[in-house]
């Protein structure tokens, strides 16, 4: 995207990310809430709107932004022009940012996921590392995942694959076995957790509410059978 907004430069626009958005089906928020998490990965909605024409216009503008490298401002200007012409209140900057960032990040990460789960790539780069933006705005639970390395087929990625909340800036990078060994980081085998020392209870940490799933995997369903990182 222009100005490398949210890390989505033109060099990182995957055709799979565009396809991920274009395959989505528009639903009202009430209809969306009735779906299971796997089905939600293939659906699209924006709270506050029930018109299919409006919802489809949102989706079309997001798809165009992903495909053509448009910015959040382009998206907001185009949507507000449409909304105001049709008797709706325009988007404020905060809502435009949430809609744009969440959908662009989800699409980008879906495209990235498909790339990383290519059989050849999986064989060469069989480990994945979770990374955050590394600043003071990173959520506590997300920060607990920073730098953790897991096998690419570890079930953790069914829960902790970004985005893991609204406006989440986390990402995942693939690694070779040699890179993992050089990093000196032990491969994790469990989700992050806290221990209540007064009771000894282990409390596993999860993504933000509504984000404990992997929409990329639900959309692409890679075949991980027979995968061996060794």
Where do the protein language model's features map onto the residues?
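Domain-core detector
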Residues: 1-165, 173-230
């Amino acid at each position: 995207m222009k100005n490398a907004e949210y890390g989505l430069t033109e060099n990182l626009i995957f055709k799979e990310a565009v396809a991920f958005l274009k395959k989505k089906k528009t639903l009202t928020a009430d209809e969306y809430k009735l779906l299971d998490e796997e089905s939600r990965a293939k659906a699209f909605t924006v709270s506050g709107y029930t018109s299919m024409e409006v919802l489809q216009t949102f989706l079309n503008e997001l798809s165009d932004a992903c495909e053509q490298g448009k910015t959040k401002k382009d998206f907001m200007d185009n949507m507000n022009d449409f909304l105001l012409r049709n008797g709706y209140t325009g988007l404020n900057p905060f809502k435009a940012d949430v809609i744009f960032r969440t959908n662009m990040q989800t699409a980008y990460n879906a495209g990235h996921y498909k790339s990383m789960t290519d059989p050849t790539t999986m064989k060469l780069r069989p480990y994945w590392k979770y990374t955050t933006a590394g600043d003071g705005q990173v959520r506590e639970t997300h920060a607990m995942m920073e730098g953790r390395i897991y096998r690419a087929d570890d079930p953790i990625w069914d829960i902790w694959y970004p985005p893991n909340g609204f406006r989440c800036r986390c990402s995942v990078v693939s690694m070779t076995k040699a890179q993992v060994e050089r990093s000196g980081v032990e491969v994790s085998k469990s989700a992050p957790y806290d221990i209540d020392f007064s009771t000894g209870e282990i409390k596993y940490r999860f993504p933000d509410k509504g984000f404990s799933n992997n929409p990329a995997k639900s959309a692409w369903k890679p075949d991980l059978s027979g995968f061996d990182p060794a």
